[in-house]
A protein has these predicted regions:
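Alpha-helical DNA-contacting segments of helix-turn-helix folds
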Residues: 45-69, 103-104
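Amphipathic alpha-helical segments used for helix-helix packing
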Residues: 91-113, 117
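Key DNA-contact positions within bacterial/archaeal DNA-binding proteins
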Residues: 40
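C-terminal peripheral helix-coil segments that are non-catalytic and often amphipathic
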Residues: 159-197
């Protein structure tokens, strides 16, 4: 808990300056000096510099969104609607920190492996928190589908910078893949009955 508080304090000091595309791994030490942030503190908390700041930002977005939506998710029966609630809240939180979100998303686009890791972690956390126990698609297939929906939604938001359009875009994707899962499950059940597999 103490480390999270320390991370948050350092991140808040840096956040205003992260909105500038001039900040990078090579000149971050100069920024730390000007903001009177001890290098030892920073490198203990964020040893991989902007990579770790980026991961922390997305993790924080998820935690904020999760707290806001968790009770509504638990009341909802439909997995597609649960997923949509989570994803919508993430996009709203992302949009509320527009400049910082643009900075880290742009940074992630230049570091695709890092962005993939972050988005996969988000999809895994969402899947765990919505409590899906259905068997229409495999464990990894569902995460991969959600990974693509989240990634596409982030790219769509980055292109349009329009929260409303992005929410509509992500909702259509979630509903489409929900229907694919139901269709696959129904087809499997039909084959089992017909051929007694």
């Amino acid at each position: 808990m103490q480390e999270t508080t320390r991370k948050n304090a350092v991140f808040k000091k840096l956040e205003i300056h992260l909105n500038s595309s001039k900040i990078n791994n090579e000149n971050i030490d100069t920024l730390l000096l000007s903001l009177k942030i001890k290098k030892s503190d920073f490198y203990t908390l964020f040893p991989k510099k902007i990579n770790d700041l980026c991961s922390y930002f997305f993790e924080n977005i998820y935690n904020i969104s999760s707290k806001k939506v968790k009770k509504r998710v638990l009341r909802e029966k439909s997995i597609s609607r649960r997923t949509n609630l989570f994803l919508s809240e993430i996009i709203k939180t992302f949009d509320s920190k527009k400049k910082t979100s643009i900075f880290f998303l742009s940074y992630g686009l230049l570091n695709p492996f890092l962005l993939s890791k972050i988005v996969y972690s988000l999809s895994s956390n969402i899947w765990y928190d919505i409590g899906d126990k259905s068997t229409d698609l495999s464990y990894y297939t569902k995460r991969l589908i959600l990974y693509n929906i989240i990634r596409n939604s982030f790219f769509y938001w980055r292109k349009t910078l329009d929260q409303k359009k992005t929410l509509s875009f992500s909702e259509r994707q979630v509903m489409f893949f929900g229907k694919v899962g139901k269709f696959k499950y129904s087809a499997k059940e039909l084959l089992i009955k017909k051929f007694k597999i």
